[in-house]
Amino acid sequence: MSESPDNDPVIISVAAYSANPIAYQEKYATHLLDRPARFTSLLSPGSHILDLGCGPGRDIRIFSEGGHKPIGIDLNPAFIEMASRQGDVIQGDIRNISSIFTPASFDGVWAQASLVHLEKSEIDFVLRDLRELLKPNGHLYACVPATGETGWLDESDGRRWYTTWPEDSFETAVRSTGFHINDVTHGPYVEVWATKV
């Protein structure tokens, strides 16, 4: 991490969620709610899943109820507290994920809206690290914004950095880091379903 905490888009963006984490939880309670079940349908029972940027822990609960073994990671202390009621969670920066977990630890990596605050220059390193954390033929789901502008957005509860990925740019980034693309959904978000090869 080269930025100081005062200038780091990830640190500033993550801190903004502390203003009202309950409102965030309520706003996104049903957002893309069918995706976790689709993801787990690709996995064997009892799979180890990394919920990257787990937020309040909605998907940790869903994965646990489905018989899987999720662990969440988030940088925001308020989200860590909330998510820990749903299952195992640790506090950490996803940009340093390879120093937190050992290679080939997970059957699946779930990154729903957790890469949105990374700058494009950081995404290649993070995707390569995620690939290393997956077991052979492990699955990745990643969802990022496809519309809007890249840059700072002042919202009612704080300032956040968003990186948008128009057209096929995110799919290209995932493929270039050694993943096989199984499916891509385009819309306001780009959703990539991929496998480690």
Q: What is each model feature region?
A:
Residues 108-121:
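A short SAM/SAH-binding and catalytic strip from SAM-dependent methyltransferases
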Residues 99-109:
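A short acidic, Gly/Pro-enriched loop at the edge of an enzyme's catalytic core
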Residues 1-101, 122-125, 129, 139-197:
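Class I (Rossmann-like) S-adenosyl-L-methionine-dependent methyltransferase catalytic domain
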